[in-house]
Amino acid sequence: MKGPIVRITPNELHIKDASFYDEIYAGSGRIRNKDERFVKTFSAPHAMVSITDHAYHRVRRGLLGEFFSQRSVIKMEPIINGAIEKLSQRLHEACQTGAVINMDAAFAAMTADVITRHAWGQSGNYLDHGNFNKQWKDAVAGTMASRVLFRHFPYMLHILMAVPLPILLKLDPGVADILKIEGLVRRLSVENVNRGIVEKQEGKTIFDALNNVSVPPEQRTAKHLIDEGHILLLAGTETTAKALSTCLCYLLLAENKNVLLALQSELRQAFPNVSTWPKWTEAQKLPYLTAVINECLRLSHGLSTRLPRTAPKESLQYKQWHIPAATPVSQTAYFVHMDPSIFPDPERFEPERWIRASKEGLHLERYIVSFSKGSRQCLGINMAYAEIFLALTHIMRNFEFQLHDTSVDDVRLFRDRFFGAAQDGSVGVRVLVNEVKY
């Protein structure tokens, strides 16, 4: 251990210094590979997220890039708005019945419906479930938490996969919900393969692109599509939903009443007709909404786990320390987002810090690393931003909420379960819907 450098494993360094983040997670002009030991924990060897080689990853990412570009996300706004409208209907019903809504599950259902529609052309219809299929969300959380364990004890994954299914179901009934996820992904992926090779990508789904004639045959197998489907469903659901539920919780805390009022005032002035659907590009222009979202992304963190990278063809220099080529190096988003030298009083929810920084010409946005950075940055960053902007714009104009048996401890990062998780016993952000404004 030397200052901010920690040899976190015998083969990996962790550097706690936000100014060095862009060096570890460099852009496409500099080669960065993933650590092979890390990607094995995904147990999805054919998915893009498991590709260690920089060049191969670049080719594979190129197949999907256009589906997540700003232009493509703008075109899919009707899909996002459709999911938000269905969620709004459920909130309206809750207002009438007095039902308590688990917003973690509700937002996860919304984002899952969006990504399944975008990826396969048909929605998973999670919003139609009575409890938003919360058991599915819990199963996903459990699956991702197990990756942290498998990272340190990789042999356990092989042992678990060898256990007969009936025994697994007795040991953990949640396995049944995981199998439902696998069944959905497998069915949709196999249907895509059975439709045959797609000649053109335009107007098609993500998985049509992966089954395109330009893709080598050995990469168009059902296994490739199934692995990619698992990762897209997980990545396209949890982090965005967590950011939204975290945002709602902070806005509804009594000490943040002025923040809530300021946000509602800005939204009502910008979009006075609640029956209209503002566009993402319009919502992005609102300074206070943007500040609120930046602060929520900072405090929800995205992935909480380490994401090691290697620079196979160059050595790195951090201050006086030389880091040999091919050494796995990582930095967690939590330490960047909670750095008091960048964000004073980092535990405090304070959107005004972004307003002040903007007026002073400071670019704090460079320190939002919820989606990582560089050539391996989250592919769905544009879709995530669109979902967050559009969902908050709609529900905060049309509904009044009250927290129900929920505190800041239900959103504050307490432990690493691959995604950041709250303290033991937390069941998420729960609300009562007090008023509907349309």
UniProtKB/Swiss-Prot annotation:
User: From which domain of life does this come?
Assistant: Eukaryota
GO terms for biological process, alphabetical: mycotoxin biosynthetic process
Extract the SUPFAM superfamilies matched here: Cytochrome P450 (SSF48264)
The annotated phenotype of a deletion mutant is: Completely abolishes the production of peniphenone D, penilactone D, penilactone A and penilactone B; but still retains the production of clavatol, hydroxyclavatol, crustosic acid and terrestric acid.
Give the UniProt keywords, A-Z: Heme, Iron, Metal-binding, Monooxygenase, Oxidoreductase
Cofactor(s) recorded for this entry are: heme
Pathway, per Swiss-Prot/TrEMBL? Answer: Secondary metabolite biosynthesis
Record-stated family: Belongs to the cytochrome P450 family.
PANTHER family under this entry? CYTOCHROME P450, N-ACETYLTRYPTOPHAN 6-HYDROXYLASE IVOC-RELATED
Designated name of the protein: Cytochrome P450 monooxygenase claJ
